Amino acid sequence: MGNILRCFKGDDDGGDHYPYYKPTSRPHYQPPHYHGQPAAPPAPLQQQHLGPHGVTPSTVGVAALAHDLLNFESTSMVPDGLSQHVVSSRKAQVKWYQKLLEAYKNTTPPPKTPANAAQLIARALNMIQRADLEGILEFYNLPIPSLPTASSNYQPSLLPEGVQFVLNTLPVYDKCIGDGDGFTAYVPTTDPRESANVPLEVHELVIARTQARKCRDYQSADALLSSLDEAGYKIISCSDDEVLARKYRIRMRGIDAPELKMPYGKESRTALVKLIGGKSVKIYVYDLDQFGRYVGDIYCNNLFIQEQMLKNGHAWHFKTYDKRPEFARWEREARAANRGLWASGNPEKPWDWRRDQRNARQDAIQVY
């Protein structure tokens, strides 16, 4: 715990600086000052009064964090007052402090300014929901770091030709897999591409829900969850934490699986569930289709999912929209081996089935 002990002693090197910060869901954040009096400029470091442990008023939050981490290492107890600022359970808070303690020990030199401490907390707890993160920072009276811009790490030259962007999802729920070629995925808003694009309305809904839960107004909290869903976002429980995530409807590029009501439709969906259910996936997005779905190539545990679906006879090659020769080859291999849907000899094409269904509905309307 050398870093934590050094925090109480202070450091005279003067090498620290404040990076630029701007609040997101708290747009009116200002440093505290006495009502009716203008905030006085900070005195030079050597002129500031030193409090207990040699801590200046401007660094009291840094010292409090160090004290709480030292206490947590000895007792495994989180600060009593933290629950008034966050909504997640005590068990989740313990996990946060385990991560914070590890990050603090690995930081050299230890954080000596509020800005440094805020950055450490934001990095160590980058997977918790934004409202909880802001609650912890508020608890220690630390500034709220600005979110990274969407283009800060974006390198389109490294992406395959035609790929617009990449999604790294949370584990895919089995119930979110609709059939053998489509599913709904959620991407955490801590992802750099997502973080800068979360609407202010969504931030406000999350904060309002947090306040409602603190007041035990669970009916209002549930209503706010519904509003989040309508905005295309969801709060997802992840390892005792809650993560704010954006919803994406995904269509797998280049394949067409039997519809659920077709022969082999349920088997095709089951095959996809076995491949990605409960797992995180990487999606290389090419475009948006007419139904608002993101069309892309899917990878999971180093497997190319379209390849697995085609090779095992769980889907057709959708030649109309994808001319990749390897897709045609994988389908031929499955046909030759009578795998999956090809075991029936002459399976109906899904696009033909959908056309017949549309025509049947139109005929029924005309007869009526």
Swiss-Prot record:
Domain TNase-like per the UniProt entry, residue ranges: 168-344
Superkingdom, natural source: Eukaryota
Cofactor note: Binds 1 Ca(2+) ion per subunit.
Needed cofactors: Ca(2+)
Biased composition annotated in UniProt, kind: Low complexity: 27-38
Catalytic site: 251, 259, 293
Coiled coil: none
Binding site for Ca(2+): 181, 256
Protein name: Probable staphylococcal-like nuclease CAN2
Species for this entry: Oryza sativa subsp. japonica
Phylogenetic lineage: Eukaryota, Viridiplantae, Streptophyta, Embryophyta, Tracheophyta
